[in-house]
Amino acid sequence: MVNLKIDHNEISVPEGTTIMEAAALAGIDIPKLCYLKNINEIAACRVCLVEVAGKEQLVTSCNNKVQEGLEILTNSPRVRVARKQNVQLILSQHDFKCATCVRSGNCTLQTLSNDLNIIDLPFKERVEHAPWDKNFPLIRDTEKCIKCMRCIQVCDKVQGLGIWDV
């Protein structure tokens, strides 16, 4: 077992546990957009950042394993600022018209944006407008894509097809 502190709570978790999994075992939810256990653990969204005592850089919690004696903060001011900036960057490349979206009210990105109190974007919007290929049997709306890689990983690892790319 590995002993560590998450948000000042002492916990013990099995070796090989990720910081995100350890936090969940402690009842702490770390926000995430791209994470799918055992399928997509690449930290593409950078939303799951946490602060680790003694480390200068914030670290992603979905793909970093716990170590003995770590002291982790999941919601420090530094983490909140970085998380908000990362979501704002994602939104700057996303069709940010939630009111007319079919997923409105059932969207992790929308919920996270609301939780982070994101009202406007400090970055210039760059939404990719690519026409749909009506001859291809699957539909992918590039204006909604947040480049999380989930669809690509599920297609590769679950379906074994490998037909998607960003």
Regions found by a protein language model. Name each.
Residues M1-N3:
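Extreme N-terminal starter segment of soluble prokaryotic enzymes
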Residues I6-N9, A53-G54:
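Short strand-turn-strand beta-turns centered on an Asx-Gly dipeptide
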Residues N9-T17:
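Short, contiguous acidic and Ser/Thr-rich linear segments
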Residues T17-E21, K65:
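Short, structural beta-strand-to-alpha-helix junction motif
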Residues I28-I30:
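Cysteine-rich modules of extracellular adhesion/ECM and protease-associated proteins
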Residues K32, L36-I39:
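Charged, low-complexity terminal tails
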Residues R46-V166:
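Fe-S ferredoxin-like electron-transfer domains
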